[in-house]
Every structure is written in structure tokens, then in C-alpha cells.
């Protein structure tokens, strides 16, 4: 893939930010992500999963460029080493309950449903969070969860410590000050063709694998959420037509996050003032046409706003609005070449990916945007 940049924003040291970013991140790159699933069942109803992973995506597509929103869902670098990416055990109890636990389990492994029908082919990471990267933050670590399901109604509850492999309570452990705790509750109703879901998530300050990162939020949203305990909520809905054709599936989601400053009271300084709290939001709408033009292929389009700060609460001051918004667009077509091989060309556009951070040392201009294209080839066997 390759990216380009435009706008009249200037570097603090002078010169166009777009030109400087083109020079830093504008080359065409070619990289890989490998995932190996080792699944075992002892009863035919349980699952012991080990997932191995390797990759060398360490550039702009891993969120490491000036525009972090270019990060892909598969953006991962292990230095070409093969590592354990997942290790958990899942088993049913009766007809209504499912329990999951392990030393390396991810939040979505313990959800009854993923609240979206979009996308069939994952590319830019933001569009894979059902519009709410705060609530559905995909934290991984040591954890356990339970799912209750009955007549299309589902309740999911889980806890994860992203630092659960450590024994020092200041930096690790389970349910300690340094655990990096992440707790999630999801309520959903999901018949065959549609569904709705609401979710709540609690994320602690010390979670090193929690919530926002450069690939699903603006720089300011990332900076403020890293400073304290975050409570997040999400509302999602999706619908799929009974027959493929002209009418697409529709997925929509919205998320809101409230971050309180660290308990030490030092807070974080923004625009010359110490903050007590901040609020951020995100949303998206995704349309997907299954069997578009040819059976087995898919056409997808999405628009949304990656997590952006909407208000801040300064000490000894009233709430202040922050113009941090940015629009993201995605268009892809997934060719199913064979049962095992698919090719997905995609284009993306970000209208204002650096948001409105007044303290930013990167830009001091009026506008900055980014456009790019990529081709993803997937082999499944």
C-alpha cells in the first residue's frame, strides 16, 4: 500500500507538513501478517485455542507514522518471530451458560456477539471496532468471562488484566493497582438477520494494552485517555437482507468515553491548564453488498469519526469544547479468487487525522488530510 498527504499545515520548524510526511511515510510498502490457529476440543462442545502469530508490519500500517489512523487491523510486528498470541479455554455449562478463561485471552473472545455485520474484509483498523473503540477496546491478557444466552437475548461479562503475568502488585497481578484492569458488560438481542447491543467498559490507568491507540483515535484523544480511569459506553445495531443483491447490509455504532485524571491529582496539562476530565466520542456507518457483481465477492463502504475529544474539564474552569473531529472514509472490494484465496483492493481518506490538539508540535496550520490505497491478499487453509 501507499499513502499521500495534502493541506496547508506547516511544521513548527517551517515547510509544509504534507511534503514532510510524504517524505517520511509516502513510500509503497509490502509486508505480511501470519496467524496459525491450533484448536482442540475434548467433548465436541468445548474449545482450547492457541493462536500463533508472526508479522513484519512496523510502518505506517501499524500506526507508527505521522498519521496513526492508517493502522490496519492486521498491523502487527513480531520481528519475524513466531509468538503465542492467544491461549484460552472455553466450555459450556448447561444450555445457557458459556465460560471462558486463560492467561492470554482477548475481550472479543468473551462476547456473545460481535455487534456488526461490517466488514467482510478488514483493512483500516478503526472500522473494525463497531464504531466504539473505547468500549470494544480488544484488550488482551489474563482474564475470564461468562456468557448467558436464551432466545436470542445475551449477556456477556468479562474481566482482563493486561499485566496479569506480573507478580509485583504495583505493576501487575490480578485486580491490583497495577493490573491494567479492563471490565466489560454487553447486553444484546441478536436474531438471525439483525441485532442491537449496548456495552459498558471500565479501563484503568495502568492498562498498557487498553483502549485507544494511534490507529483508532486522534492524537489528543489518545493523550488524554492515557492519563486516567476511563468509563466507556457503546450502542450498536446491524441488519442484513435475507437475499443478496442491490440492498446492502447496514451496520452502525456510536461510543462515548469519560476519562478522569489520575488519582495522584497531577492531571495532565493542555492549553496551559491542568485537566480534571475529558470526554471523547466516535461513530461509524458501514454498508456492505454481499455477492456484489459476482457470487462470493463483497463491496463495502464506510464513513465515521475515529475517537475525538468533544469536551474537557479544566481545574477551576468550566467545560471547554475542543474542535478535534476528523472524518474517515473507506471503500473496498473483496475478490474471492478461490475458496482459499481472496484479493481486496481498498482506498481510504482522512479529512483531519491529527485533530485539533493545541499543544501539538507537529502542525501549526489550517488543514491536513491524507489519502491512500492498498491491496490485501489473504490465504486461508
Put a short name on every predicted segment.
Residues 268-274:
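Transmembrane alpha-helix entry/boundary detector in multi-pass membrane proteins
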Residues 58-60, 104-119, 299-310:
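Surface-exposed extracellular loop regions of Gram-negative outer-membrane beta-barrel proteins
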Residues 207-209:
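Short glycine/acidic-rich loop motifs that flank beta-strands on beta-rich extracellular proteins
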